[in-house]
Protein backbone atom coordinates (compact mmCIF):
# COMPACT_ATOMS: atom_id res chain seq x y z
CA UNK A 1 0.00 0.00 0.00
CA UNK A 2 1.34 3.49 -0.79
CA UNK A 3 0.65 4.67 2.76
CA UNK A 4 3.08 2.06 4.15
CA UNK A 5 6.08 3.87 2.64
CA UNK A 6 7.79 6.24 5.05
CA UNK A 7 8.00 9.88 4.01
CA UNK A 8 11.06 10.58 6.14
CA UNK A 9 14.55 10.21 4.65
CA UNK A 10 16.23 6.89 5.51
CA UNK A 11 19.08 7.12 8.05
CA UNK A 12 21.79 6.87 5.41
CA UNK A 13 20.36 9.92 3.62
CA UNK A 14 19.50 12.02 6.67
CA UNK A 15 22.68 14.11 6.52
CA UNK A 16 22.24 14.86 2.82
CA UNK A 17 18.61 15.81 3.39
CA UNK A 18 19.54 18.21 6.21
CA UNK A 19 22.32 19.72 4.09
CA UNK A 20 20.11 20.38 1.06
CA UNK A 21 16.89 21.41 2.80
CA UNK A 22 18.18 22.96 6.04
CA UNK A 23 15.42 24.31 8.26
CA UNK A 24 12.86 23.46 5.58
CA UNK A 25 13.42 19.72 5.90
CA UNK A 26 10.05 19.25 7.60
CA UNK A 27 8.41 20.85 4.56
CA UNK A 28 10.31 18.46 2.29
CA UNK A 29 9.07 15.54 4.40
CA UNK A 30 5.50 16.81 4.01
CA UNK A 31 5.96 16.94 0.24
CA UNK A 32 7.46 13.45 0.25
CA UNK A 33 4.36 12.31 2.11
CA UNK A 34 2.15 13.65 -0.66
CA UNK A 35 4.24 11.94 -3.33
CA UNK A 36 4.29 8.47 -1.74
CA UNK A 37 0.55 8.53 -1.02
CA UNK A 38 -1.59 10.69 -3.27
CA UNK A 39 1.11 10.86 -5.94
CA UNK A 40 1.16 7.08 -6.27
CA UNK A 41 -2.62 6.70 -6.16
CA UNK A 42 -3.02 9.29 -8.93
CA UNK A 43 -0.32 7.75 -11.11
CA UNK A 44 2.24 10.55 -10.85
CA UNK A 45 4.80 8.39 -9.06
CA UNK A 46 5.26 4.70 -9.79
CA UNK A 47 4.77 2.35 -6.82
CA UNK A 48 8.33 1.10 -7.18
CA UNK A 49 9.65 4.66 -7.00
CA UNK A 50 7.96 5.45 -3.68
CA UNK A 51 10.58 3.72 -1.48
CA UNK A 52 13.30 5.57 -3.41
CA UNK A 53 11.62 8.96 -3.32
CA UNK A 54 14.49 10.61 -1.44
CA UNK A 55 17.59 9.44 -3.30
CA UNK A 56 16.17 9.24 -6.84
CA UNK A 57 13.88 12.24 -6.71
CA UNK A 58 13.98 14.74 -3.82
CA UNK A 59 17.73 14.86 -3.21
CA UNK A 60 18.49 14.47 -6.90
CA UNK A 61 16.40 17.56 -7.66
CA UNK A 62 17.40 19.62 -4.62
CA UNK A 63 21.07 19.36 -5.59
CA UNK A 64 20.32 21.47 -8.67
CA UNK A 65 19.69 24.50 -6.45
CA UNK A 66 23.41 25.26 -6.50
CA UNK A 67 23.12 26.21 -10.19
CA UNK A 68 20.33 28.76 -9.62
CA UNK A 69 21.22 32.34 -8.63
CA UNK A 70 19.69 33.98 -5.57
CA UNK A 71 16.23 35.45 -6.10
CA UNK A 72 15.69 33.93 -9.55
CA UNK A 73 12.36 33.42 -11.26
CA UNK A 74 12.18 29.77 -12.29
CA UNK A 75 9.95 28.12 -14.90
CA UNK A 76 9.78 24.35 -14.50
CA UNK A 77 8.70 22.80 -17.80
CA UNK A 78 6.85 19.49 -17.79
CA UNK A 79 6.73 19.66 -14.02
CA UNK A 80 4.76 16.44 -13.57
CA UNK A 81 4.61 15.80 -9.83
CA UNK A 82 6.70 18.92 -9.16
CA UNK A 83 10.15 17.57 -9.98
CA UNK A 84 12.34 19.56 -9.84
CA UNK A 85 10.31 22.79 -9.56
CA UNK A 86 8.43 22.14 -6.34
CA UNK A 87 11.51 20.64 -4.73
CA UNK A 88 13.44 23.82 -5.54
CA UNK A 89 10.64 25.96 -4.10
CA UNK A 90 10.81 23.94 -0.88
CA UNK A 91 14.59 24.12 -0.62
CA UNK A 92 14.95 27.75 -1.76
CA UNK A 93 12.36 30.20 -0.38
CA UNK A 94 14.12 33.03 -2.26
CA UNK A 95 12.94 31.64 -5.60
CA UNK A 96 9.73 32.49 -7.45
CA UNK A 97 8.67 29.28 -9.21
CA UNK A 98 6.14 28.59 -11.96
CA UNK A 99 5.24 24.95 -12.55
CA UNK A 100 4.32 24.43 -16.22
CA UNK A 101 2.41 21.22 -16.96
CA UNK A 102 0.02 20.38 -19.83
CA UNK A 103 -1.94 17.50 -18.25
CA UNK A 104 -4.99 18.31 -16.14
CA UNK A 105 -4.58 15.52 -13.59
CA UNK A 106 -1.02 16.60 -12.90
CA UNK A 107 -1.84 20.28 -12.61
CA UNK A 108 -4.65 19.38 -10.19
CA UNK A 109 -2.14 17.55 -7.99
CA UNK A 110 0.31 20.45 -8.18
CA UNK A 111 -2.32 23.02 -7.21
CA UNK A 112 -3.33 20.92 -4.21
CA UNK A 113 0.29 20.31 -3.19
CA UNK A 114 1.14 24.02 -3.34
CA UNK A 115 -1.86 24.78 -1.13
CA UNK A 116 -1.13 22.01 1.39
CA UNK A 117 2.53 23.02 1.65
CA UNK A 118 1.55 26.70 2.04
CA UNK A 119 3.74 27.76 -0.89
CA UNK A 120 1.22 29.89 -2.78
CA UNK A 121 3.21 33.06 -2.10
CA UNK A 122 6.17 31.79 -4.14
CA UNK A 123 4.75 29.11 -6.46
CA UNK A 124 2.15 29.23 -9.21
CA UNK A 125 0.86 26.43 -11.45
CA UNK A 126 0.17 27.03 -15.14
CA UNK A 127 -1.47 24.46 -17.37
CA UNK A 128 0.01 24.55 -20.86
CA UNK A 129 2.82 23.45 -23.12
CA UNK A 130 6.16 25.21 -23.31
CA UNK A 131 5.43 26.40 -26.86
CA UNK A 132 2.18 28.01 -25.71
CA UNK A 133 3.78 29.64 -22.68
CA UNK A 134 6.50 31.17 -24.86
CA UNK A 135 4.18 32.55 -27.54
CA UNK A 136 1.01 33.21 -25.59
CA UNK A 137 -0.86 30.76 -27.81
CA UNK A 138 -3.86 28.76 -26.70
CA UNK A 139 -5.07 31.57 -24.48
CA UNK A 140 -2.09 31.15 -22.14
CA UNK A 141 -0.33 34.27 -20.88
CA UNK A 142 3.28 34.38 -22.15
CA UNK A 143 5.86 33.91 -19.42
CA UNK A 144 9.64 34.03 -19.12
CA UNK A 145 12.06 33.28 -16.32
CA UNK A 146 15.66 33.78 -15.28
CA UNK A 147 16.07 30.00 -15.19
CA UNK A 148 14.10 27.30 -17.01
CA UNK A 149 14.33 23.81 -15.57
CA UNK A 150 13.32 20.47 -17.06
CA UNK A 151 13.78 16.85 -16.04
CA UNK A 152 13.53 13.77 -18.27
CA UNK A 153 11.43 15.62 -20.83
CA UNK A 154 13.10 15.14 -24.24
CA UNK A 155 16.44 15.00 -26.11
CA UNK A 156 18.50 18.17 -25.87
CA UNK A 157 17.64 19.56 -29.31
CA UNK A 158 13.90 19.46 -28.67
CA UNK A 159 14.35 20.61 -25.11
CA UNK A 160 16.30 23.67 -26.26
CA UNK A 161 13.68 24.45 -28.92
CA UNK A 162 10.90 24.37 -26.33
CA UNK A 163 12.66 25.91 -23.34
CA UNK A 164 15.19 28.53 -24.51
CA UNK A 165 12.42 30.93 -25.64
CA UNK A 166 11.12 30.84 -22.05
CA UNK A 167 14.40 32.17 -20.65
CA UNK A 168 14.98 35.90 -20.51
CA UNK A 169 17.97 37.10 -22.60
CA UNK A 170 20.97 36.22 -20.47
CA UNK A 171 18.94 33.61 -18.62
CA UNK A 172 19.59 29.91 -18.77
CA UNK A 173 18.15 26.47 -19.29
CA UNK A 174 19.12 23.91 -16.64
CA UNK A 175 18.18 20.42 -17.82
CA UNK A 176 18.57 17.42 -15.55
CA UNK A 177 20.18 14.61 -17.52
CA UNK A 178 21.77 11.24 -16.98
CA UNK A 179 24.83 9.46 -18.30
CA UNK A 180 24.10 10.58 -21.87
CA UNK A 181 24.71 14.27 -21.12
CA UNK A 182 28.15 14.54 -22.75
CA UNK A 183 26.99 12.68 -25.85
CA UNK A 184 23.90 14.88 -26.15
CA UNK A 185 26.01 18.03 -25.97
CA UNK A 186 28.30 16.77 -28.74
CA UNK A 187 25.34 15.78 -30.91
CA UNK A 188 23.15 18.85 -30.47
CA UNK A 189 25.50 21.80 -29.80
CA UNK A 190 25.12 23.15 -33.36
CA UNK A 191 21.32 23.11 -33.12
CA UNK A 192 21.47 24.85 -29.74
CA UNK A 193 23.62 27.58 -31.31
CA UNK A 194 21.07 28.12 -34.09
CA UNK A 195 18.38 28.50 -31.43
CA UNK A 196 20.31 31.32 -29.76
CA UNK A 197 21.92 29.29 -27.02
CA UNK A 198 25.51 29.36 -25.86
CA UNK A 199 27.80 26.38 -25.68
CA UNK A 200 26.05 23.71 -23.55
CA UNK A 201 27.94 22.95 -20.34
CA UNK A 202 27.74 19.77 -18.27
CA UNK A 203 27.79 20.20 -14.49
CA UNK A 204 27.62 17.70 -11.64
CA UNK A 205 25.59 19.02 -8.72
CA UNK A 206 25.70 17.95 -5.09
CA UNK A 207 29.15 16.38 -5.21
CA UNK A 208 30.04 15.10 -1.75
CA UNK A 209 26.40 15.33 -0.66
CA UNK A 210 24.42 13.10 -3.02
CA UNK A 211 25.71 9.95 -4.67
CA UNK A 212 25.82 9.93 -7.58
CA UNK A 213 25.80 13.70 -8.15
CA UNK A 214 23.03 15.13 -10.29
CA UNK A 215 24.12 15.76 -13.87
CA UNK A 216 22.73 18.83 -15.61
CA UNK A 217 23.22 20.47 -18.98
CA UNK A 218 23.23 24.24 -18.70
CA UNK A 219 22.64 26.53 -21.69
CA UNK A 220 22.67 30.32 -21.58
CA UNK A 221 20.25 32.18 -23.83
CA UNK A 222 22.71 34.46 -25.60
CA UNK A 223 20.58 35.65 -28.51
CA UNK A 224 16.90 36.08 -29.30
CA UNK A 225 16.10 34.08 -32.44
CA UNK A 226 12.87 34.51 -34.35
CA UNK A 227 10.81 31.31 -34.43
CA UNK A 228 10.96 29.38 -37.67
CA UNK A 229 8.03 29.98 -39.98
CA UNK A 230 5.98 26.93 -40.92
CA UNK A 231 6.58 25.71 -44.45
CA UNK A 232 3.75 26.49 -46.90
CA UNK A 233 1.63 23.55 -47.98
CA UNK A 234 2.60 22.03 -51.31
CA UNK A 235 0.26 22.46 -54.25
CA UNK A 236 -0.87 19.47 -56.24
CA UNK A 237 -0.95 19.54 -60.02
CA UNK A 238 -4.60 20.55 -59.87
CA UNK A 239 -3.70 23.63 -57.89
CA UNK A 240 -5.04 22.38 -54.59
CA UNK A 241 -2.97 22.51 -51.43
CA UNK A 242 -1.99 19.19 -49.97
Curated annotation (Swiss-Prot):
Keywords: Cytoplasm, Methyltransferase, rRNA processing, S-adenosyl-L-methionine, Transferase. S-adenosyl-L-methionine binds at residues 78, 83, 130-131, 151. It comes from the Bacteria. It holds the Pfam family GidB. Coiled coil: none annotated. GO terms for cellular component: cytosol. Its EC number is 2.1.1.-. InterPro entries: rRNA_ssu_MeTfrase_G, SAM-dependent_MTases_sf. Its main location: cytoplasm. Specifically methylates the N7 position of guanine in position 518 of 16S rRNA. This is Ribosomal RNA small subunit methyltransferase G. It comes from Salinispora tropica (strain ATCC BAA-916 / DSM 44818 / JCM 13857 / NBRC 105044 / CNB-440).
